[in-house]
Amino acid sequence: MQGIILQIVGLLIIITLIILFFSKPNVDNVETKTYAKLIGLNFLFVIIGITTYFIARLTSNLNLIGIFQKIYMSILTLLNLYSMYYCLFVYDKEKRFIKLKKILFIITIIAILGILFLPLNVIYKGDLLDGTGLSYNVAIGHTILSFSFFIIITIYLVIKKYSIKKIIPYIILIILYLVGFIVRSYYKELIFEGFFYSYILFIMYNTIENPDVKMAKELAFQKELALEASNKTLNLICDIENNLKS
């Protein structure tokens, strides 16, 4: 059971995010739309991960486990794709990278087909649930591609002296994965991908344009304008009174 503890925590985080994000109006832009897709995909990702674990525990049917593992890895590639899209959408205001987005989409489709149709060797021993084979390698390769993309984008933004605030969660994701692989060398049964994505999406929630904050700023600005206009009116009345008295 300890193998999916992180997945369960990840599920609690993503459910909380879904409630927070969809329970109030959001700014209608590409950033929030992409973020909505990310949290939706991550919810499915975690659910499939937990379901796969229980199917393994209850049935030990390697063929059925393999099918769910392939679905799990396919959703991971979509998470990677929309994460790369997110980085481009946030910074590509002039839409200069349309061709790059198409290339990333095509690579992802090919990766998903490879995951679904290439052989996968299911590893299930005790609490350990893993896989090897060409299908697994394709999923790992696509994840490495996305991480390389995040690093390149970060370097580009630093060189151009742009803010990297919105891409920091993905740098944290890379660090978490590296730490996760080290920890997994000692606790091989741990499944951490869903938890890590839930965690960085929680961080991202605080970097996207918050409609409540935006509204509060607009109200404060309107209040300041009204106060300034009121002061000018009072000053004008005082000046008129002084002129009448003189």
Regions found by a protein language model. Give the residues of each.
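Extracellular-loop-to-transmembrane junctions of the mid-late helices
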Residues: 1-12, 107-156, 180-186, 190
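Interfacial "cap-and-anchor" motif at the non-cytosolic start of specific transmembrane alpha-helices
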Residues: 3, 158-221
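Hydrophobic alpha-helical transmembrane segments of multi-pass membrane proteins
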Residues: 4-86, 103-121, 170-185
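Alpha-helical transmembrane segments in multipass membrane proteins, preferentially the mid-helix core
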Residues: 16-22, 82-86, 143-164
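Membrane-helix boundary/juxtamembrane motif in polytopic membrane proteins
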Residues: 34, 99-100, 131-139, 154-175
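Non-cytosolic membrane-interface motifs at loop->transmembrane helix junctions
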Residues: 61-72, 127-139, 192-197
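Class A GPCR helix-loop hinge within the 7TM core
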Residues: 84-95
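PAS/LOV and related PAS-like sensory modules
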Residues: 223-246
